[in-house]
Amino acid sequence: MEVIEGRKLVSHRSVFVRFPIRDKDQEYLLVWTTTPWTLTSNVVVAVNVNLEYVKLKSSDGSIYYFAKDNLEYQRLEKQFAEKKQWIDGVPKLKTIAQIFKEHGGYEVLGSVKGSDLVGLEYIGPYDDLDAQNTAGGYPYVNEDLEKNGITSVMQHKVIDPGKDKIGNDIVVSGEGT
């Protein structure tokens, strides 16, 4: 039996996480992750300094920043359309615009360059835990993601997620918002 024959395609939840921006009331960085179990080890949000990020106001007055191209982007559209790497019965993913519309609507206030986000600080989801608590929060950083073969426009990262028995990283950076 080939190893591939023993593989099984399973579904799990992906999540959107809003990271409060320190010293900005009701302003958040919005990140989508397909690996929510890594959020406990989250230490930095990476942005692409060359991209435009939308500044969106939701119906509750909260302001969100995420890659402008992702507002109407249909995540995993190719996999859904081809039924390749897609489980029967799992619905098509909604765009961010659809999600905000379903929750009362939104208004686009403008856009900012990714470089304008560098240096802002956010509050991580587990910063209240002693092991995660770092004075001042974690800064946005400028990383050359493309050079590292990562094409997502924003993502959360972990420190030392571990390695398998042959030395490969167990957790690698995935698609983000």
Predicted regions and their residues:
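NTP-handling and nucleic-acid-processing catalytic cores
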Residues: 1-177
